[in-house]
């Protein structure tokens, strides 16, 4: 708390006054990070976009967000080390994820009605898969580079992974 207070140019007592505890402060930080992601996702208007292009734009948007905001992934990784202790205590975070899943559900439904997408696609599971494809490369970029000698934060590598991940998602979605 002392380091946080110094960086915020305040004192520990003020932090405890506003947040109550280290745990409540961390929960507030998580909620803030997820709110920023949700606000960014809300700005993405995919209503009139063809379903295949809408899924592609949503995926690229999320993956680019992760790349531009690796602090979100660090927070989530830290939370996973704590077995989601703080997220479990926050109803707000669960509520924040719902709008993008609802947006994706509408896109999937439009694609199904157009005869493009399979009918048995669960929006939440698809979102988790979509998210995971972008998450892994950003979250693990340092160990991937050390292990394989490839810098996945470099534009050329990133573009190749995005292309492959997009093809994977669409291959799963498309009616066979």
Language-model-derived ranges and their functions:
Residues 61-64, 68, 98-114, 132-176:
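C-terminal peripheral helix-coil segments that are non-catalytic and often amphipathic
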Residues 68-91, 141-148:
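Amphipathic alpha-helical segments used for helix-helix packing
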Residues 38, 118, 172:
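Ligand-binding pocket scaffold of soluble enzyme catalytic domains
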Residues 27, 31, 35, 64, ...:
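Generic alpha-helical structural context detector
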Residues 1-24, 28:
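Helix-turn-helix
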Residues 53, 92-96, 113-129:
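All-alpha amphipathic helical-bundle segments outside canonical DNA-binding/catalytic cores
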Residues 7, 24-47, 53, 57-64, ...:
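Alpha-helical structural segments
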